[in-house]
Curated annotation (Swiss-Prot):
Gene3D superfamilies: P-loop containing nucleotide triphosphate hydrolases (3.40.50.300). InterPro entries: G_ENGB_dom, GTP-bd, GTP-bd_ribosome_bio_YsxC, P-loop_NTPase. The lineage of its organism: Bacteria, Pseudomonadati, Pseudomonadota, Gammaproteobacteria, Alteromonadales. One of its GO terms (molecular function) is GTP binding. It holds the Pfam family MMR_HSR1. Mg(2+) binds at residues 46, 68. This is Probable GTP-binding protein EngB. It comes from Shewanella amazonensis (strain ATCC BAA-1098 / SB2B). Necessary for normal cell division and for the maintenance of normal septation. One of its GO terms (cellular component) is cytosol. Residues 31-205 form the EngB-type G domain.
Amino acid sequence: MNQTRIDFRQAKFLISAPDIAHLDKHLPGDVGVEIAFAGRSNAGKSSALNALTEQKSLARTSKTPGRTQLINVFELDAQRRLVDLPGYGFAKVPLEMKHKWQNALGEYLQKRACLSGVVVLMDIRHPLKDLDRQMIEWSVASEIPVLALLTKADKLGQSEKMKTVNAVRKELAEFGDWVSVEPFSALKGTGKPKVLAILDAWCHPDWLVEELEQAED
């Protein structure tokens, strides 16, 4: 049963931006709330988005990691959006393109005022690669909360899963309340209620709630 204030099942495709280096030209105005999803190309980002919104093909999945180079924006309502950023770190992507993505991702995290939270997705079997940590550090430096989402949790037994979750929490403890860590399985639904609760809170920052209340008066 959905206990969140936002019905994430209502997410719908809004726009694609073909070039991450020119994000501002393609994305909606820097208003309202955006939640970004970032992760390595094999982290299961599209599957997670589809599972969280209960839509089989909202985000297109590919059997070839690194193929999706578009920034895809999904609208929850007039004020709130989910942003699916291109996967990073895939070995077969040319080095120049990797650097281009990384620079633009960093700029997006640092300059996008409406960014309310970042979900950094990592395969639970291979967490906290260098680029994952860089995304987390960039976000926290910009005072943007992070959910480190350990995907494919069904690939590990319960004991090994919790051992990994606790190890990642310990590793990221230096960031304090800015970073939370949760296991997730798109296949089994593991962690889905907690993730939706976090996303829902990000969708309701104090300033937006006050703005909407004033508009109703």
